[in-house]
Amino acid sequence: MKFEHRSVMPREVRDGLDLKPGETCVDCTLGGSGHAVTSLAAVLPNGRLIGIDQDLDAIENAHRVFADDMANVSIFHDNFSHLPAILDSLGIKGVDGILLDLGLSLHQLRKGQRGFSFKGDEPLDMRMDMRTALTAADLVNTLEERALVDIFFKYGEEKMSRKIARAIVRQRASAPITRNCELAEIVRAAIPAKIVHQQKIHPATRVFQALRISVNRELEQLERFLETFVDFLNPGGRICIISFHSLEDRMVKRRFRALEQGCTCPRDFPECVCGFKPRLKSVTKRAVMPTPEEIEINPMARSARLRVAWRV
C-alpha cells in the first residue's frame, strides 16, 4: 500500500535544521519520510539519518524509500520518547539535528482503517502502535462518565464534555460503540444544533483528538522526550518540533523557555547558587506557521506550529 502523506512546512524545516554534509540527524516521526529524504540528502555522502516511528506502516514505507541508502540510514520501529535508548544502541553520544513532527499522516486518516477520522466507517481503534492493547473503543465503552468528561476536557478542551460523555454512556447501555461513525454521530447529536452551526470544525473533532491522545499517551511521551532531548544535541545542533494543537505547543514552548533560562534561583538572590546554565536558544521568538499558499495546497497544515532552537 502506498503511504499517502504530504510533509508540513518542508522548506521551513529544512532551513530550521540547517544540516551539513557529514552530520547526524534524527527524524523522530518518519511518517511518509518526506522530511527524512530532505535531511538525508543534506548530510550525504558521509552523514547519517536515524528514523523512528511507532506506526508499522511508516516503517515499512521508510524501508522502501531508503532501500538504496541503508548504509547511511538506521530505522527503528519505536516511540520517539525512547530516543536515549535508541542512540545508545547505536553508540551515538550526540546528534546535529532532531525533527519531531507530532501530526497525523494523511495515510493514517484515510487508509489506516483505525478510526482516527470521524469520516467513513472504520473500527474505533486509534492506536498508532498496533502492538499496544488499549483502543479508543475500550475507553468509550468502559470508562465511567466522569473519566470520559475529564479526557474530553483535558485533552480536547471540549466545552461540551459533560453532555457528550452522558450521551456516550446512555448509548453504550444499549450496545457497545465500536465504529468511528457511530461515535461521531453520538457526539454531533449531543451538541445543541445552534452550537454545531457556529463551529468551524466538525463537532466530533475535539473528542476524537482527546481519545487519540489518551490511547497513545501522547502528552506523556512528549513530556519524556522534552526532558531528555537536549542531552543528545551537539553544541550548535538544532531541534525542530511541529505541533498541531495548543496542548503540545504550550509544552514545547515552556520547555524551550526553561532550557533558555538556565538559572532557576529566586530573583532576589544576590548571585546564582543553582549552577544551571542556558542550554538552548530559540531561533525565532514565536512559532512559525504555514503560509496561506501551503494551507491551500495542504489543508492539514493549517494548525501546524513549528518551533526551532539550537544547542548553546
From Swiss-Prot:
Gene3D superfamilies hit by this protein: Putative methyltransferase TM0872, insert domain, Vaccinia Virus protein VP39
GO annotation, cellular component aspect: cytoplasm
Keyword rRNA processing: yes
Group of enzyme by EC: transferase
Cysteine pairings via disulfide bonds: none
Reaction(s) this enzyme catalyzes, per UniProt: cytidine(1402) in 16S rRNA + S-adenosyl-L-methionine = N(4)-methylcytidine(1402) in 16S rRNA + S-adenosyl-L-homocysteine + H(+)
Protein location: Cytoplasm
Keyword list, A-Z: Cytoplasm, Methyltransferase, rRNA processing, S-adenosyl-L-methionine, Transferase
Binding, S-adenosyl-L-methionine: 33-35, 53, 80, 101, 108
One GO process term, biological-process aspect: rRNA base methylation
One annotated GO molecular function: rRNA (cytosine-N4-)-methyltransferase activity
Pfam families: Methyltransf_5
Keyword Nucleus: no
HAMAP family: 16SrRNA_methyltr_H
Its job: Specifically methylates the N4 position of cytidine in position 1402 (C1402) of 16S rRNA.
Family membership noted in the UniProt record: Belongs to the methyltransferase superfamily. RsmH family.
Protein name: Ribosomal RNA small subunit methyltransferase H
Protein source organism: Desulforapulum autotrophicum (strain ATCC 43914 / DSM 3382 / VKM B-1955 / HRM2)
Lineage of producing organism: Bacteria, Pseudomonadati, Thermodesulfobacteriota, Desulfobacteria, Desulfobacterales
